[in-house]
Every structure is written in structure tokens, then in C-alpha cells.
Regions:
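Structural secondary-structure packing elements that flank or coincide with functional cores
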Residues: 1-9, 82-112
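Long, amphipathic alpha-helical coiled-coil segments characteristic
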Residues: 3-48
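Generic structural signal for well-ordered, non-transmembrane alpha-helical segments
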Residues: 17-20, 24, 43, 50, ...
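Secondary-structure edge/capping motif, primarily at the C-terminal ends of alpha-helices
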Residues: 26-37, 56-59, 75-85, 104-107, ...
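Short, well-ordered alpha-helical segments
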Residues: 41-45, 58-74, 88-96
């Protein structure tokens, strides 16, 4: 990385545990929805994902923030019935949550 693209991992390291916790809670809410089909779990997932988005804004990770916005929009569409809250969309959301966590882990490990 050169100086113009180097990412300062300090701020991310300060909030990473909170991000991980919010991602875990979001995933747990998705799992709860898969077991019960109670749409309130989709709302809980969206709430936790919104917390992740806020932390990403603070640390300046706009690309990942855009992914959280897209996932949040998908969750909202599932919640309102605009998009089916089916296995495929739940799996897609779950993969997105895992991808966010993996990407942030890689950033902290010095990978880009």
C-alpha cells in the first residue's frame, strides 16, 4: 500500500469488538427468523446491522458501509413484504454479514 491508500487500523481496532458483537446478534436474529418466520427478527437483524453501519462511518470504511446499506435495504424490503423473506434472501444476508466480518478481520491482519 502506498501512503495515499493506506488505511489506519487504529480506529477500527477500537470498535471491532462492538462490530463483531452486532454482527453476531444480527446473524442470531436471522437464525431466529429462519426457525420462527417472525418478521420481528428481521427488524432486530436490521437494527444490529445499522449499528455496524454507524461504526463503519466513524472509522471511514465507505465501501463496507455501502454493503451494510444494501443489506439493510434488503432486510427492510423483506420486512415490508416488497421482497420475499425466503431462504435464498436470508442466506444472501447471512453471507453478507459473514463477508463483512471476514473483510474487517483481514484489514486488521494487514491484508487489503
Amino acid at each position: 500500500m502506498n501512503a495515499s491508500t493506506e488505511f489506519d487500523t487504529g480506529p477500527l481496532s477500537w470498535v471491532k469488538n462492538e462490530i463483531d458483537l452486532a454482527l453476531e446478534r444480527a446473524a442470531n436474529a436471522l437464525n431466529a427468523y429462519a426457525e420462527s418466520a417472525d418478521l420481528s427478527h428481521i427488524q432486530y437483524c436490521r437494527t444490529h446491522l445499522h449499528q455496524v453501519q454507524g461504526a463503519l462511518i466513524i472509522v471511514g470504511l465507505d465501501g463496507v458501509r455501502q454493503l451494510t446499506e444494501a443489506l439493510e435495504a434488503l432486510l427492510e424490503a423483506m420486512e415490508t413484504g416488497t421482497v420475499a423473506a425466503n431462504r435464498a434472501n436470508i442466506a444472501l444476508t447471512y453471507q453478507g454479514l459473514q463477508g463483512i466480518g471476514s473483510y474487517l478481520d483481514a484489514l486488521l491482519a494487514g491484508q487489503n
